[in-house]
Amino acid sequence: MNGNKHLLGFDYAYHISKLLFEQLEELVTGALESMKTGTVTDSFEKLIFAAIAITGIVSGICKGSNQCAIAHKFYEECRSFFYENTLNFLHGELVAVGLLVRLSYFGSDCAYMINELTTLKLPKCLSELNIPTDAVEKFADELCNSSAINDTSDISRKRMLDALEIIKK
């Protein structure tokens, strides 16, 4: 724990998120099988509960601090500017690609996330979302102008363009 009373919630949110991620990893295979067979299993119920309720708790603890704002703004830009292209994708699929951008923007290694998306047969790049790769310029502008970044300086734009390289295929 960092001891700063203003950041204490983030410490708790981090640990809850870590536990949530570990639980989701354990449950996802069984939940996907449950979905394929059309049966509601314990794994499926636990995964749905964790994904909705626990994520809501973490969000509440963080008081809307933009913890995944880049990922959600990416989703919004997909729906705003590439609606027809992304019509057949779920909210979570678009946010997952946005998470790659967020991880890259903050300097995290994306290999694990890319591997997980590949294993689950989920999109991980613009071409898999039916979005042209030259759209990175549009995404960079929109994301830098959004409440997620709110910095239109050349340095910020370059950092965002660099982050978007992870999904430019």
What are the residue ranges of the model-derived segments?
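Long hydrophobic alpha-helical segments that form multi-pass transmembrane helix bundles
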Residues: 1-2, 20, 126
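C-terminal charged capping/lid subdomain of soluble metabolic enzymes
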Residues: 107-169
